[in-house]
A protein has these predicted regions:
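Cysteine-dependent hydrolase recognition
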Residues: 11-295
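Bacterial Sec-dependent N-terminal signal peptides
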Residues: 1-12
Length: 295
């Protein structure tokens, strides 16, 4: 693979071999992750380039979110950046005084711990118009940085680019090994001839505050992103928790499908547990008893 490497103010840019024309993409990672997963990250960069998406890799020993955002804005202005993926240990903005823009999360910020009552959000990085006032860095979890949404900031979200994170889970396995394995799978999948044309989306109890009005537009969003999925009947399937009293079997049967390309879950849960549904709606006491026995 041909690429060039440029070091600028401590950040190192691994430039794409493909010339940037209309758009580009960036992998933002930390120095340790890049050194441990260089082969896999460059393979990912190469496969995206072959598909027509010039991709930068930028790594550094990041000290604060502002440093990351400067790089993103620079690439956006100079190279028509359309999106980024944060890989490894990238600073996490913990936002306060912004709960009016969350879909459901509400917690008293005055009487609860900062860590619990703040919102970790990468809107700090991908919505360039939002403005923030820095408060402090967490003294225990050094990757957390607390900000207030500034009074003079826009009070609505309009992202300029898309963003995502690839972060290892704390399950006892070496973090870089997890990330390496993930990108090997990603590259292998990109090299197959299997088109992404079979998707399944499930919405659990409590998601979107159980609002049908909020849930319905998902089909339009996915149609915009993956129009080919809707060319034939049965390629896109959507299930809500209240389509049946006990949807667990329906969900499992969907996940067993050998032709399934993508599953999307909107649920509440814990790191090792997902809540598929709640108790079936009923006004009869014996139905409540039956539900308790079932669970």
């Amino acid at each position: 693979m041909l690429c060039s490497i440029l070091s600028l103010r401590a950040q190192t840019f691994v430039k794409p071999a493909v010339k940037v024309k209309d758009t580009s993409f960036a992998v933002i990672t930390d120095k340790g992750t890049f050194q441990a997963c260089e082969t896999e990250l460059k393979a990912y960069q190469e496969i995206l380039g072959k598909e027509g998406l010039p991709t930068f890799i930028v790594y550094n020993e990041w000290k604060k979110p502002e440093d990351v955002k400067k790089v993103i804005v620079k690439l956006y202005k100079k190279d028509n950046l359309e999106g980024v993926v944060f890989v490894g240990d990238i600073p996490i903005p913990m936002l306060r005084k912004a709960q009016h823009m969350t879909s459901a999360f509400k917690m008293d910020e005055k009487n609860n711990d900062w860590r619990d009552s703040s919102v970790p959000s990468d809107r700090f990085y991908d919505d360039f118009d939002l403005q923030f006032d820095f408060l402090k860095q967490d003294s225990v979890e050094n990757n957390f940085f607390y900000y207030n949404l500034a009074i003079k900031s826009p009070q609505q979200i309009r992202c300029d680019i898309y963003s995502a994170r690839v972060k290892a889970v704390d399950n006892g396995e070496e973090p870089h090994a997890q990330i390496s394995r993930y990108f090997k799978k990603v590259v292998a999948e990109h090299q197959t001839n299997n088109k992404l044309d079979q998707i399944f989306s499930y919405t659990g109890d409590g998601s979107y505050s159980n609002s049908l009005t909020a849930w319905t537009p998902e089909t339009f969003t996915i149609r915009e992103q993956m129009p080919g999925v809707f060319d034939k009947e049965g390629r896109a399937r959507f299930i809500r928790y209240n389509f049946s009293d006990y949807p667990k079997d329906d969900v499992i049967n969907m996940l067993k499908r050998t032709d399934l390309d993508l599953s999307i879950f909107h649920e509440h849960g814990m790191p090792e547990r997902q809540y598929l549904s709640g108790s079936p709606a009923t006004n009869r006491w014996n139905a409540h008893v039956d539900a308790m026995k079932y669970y």
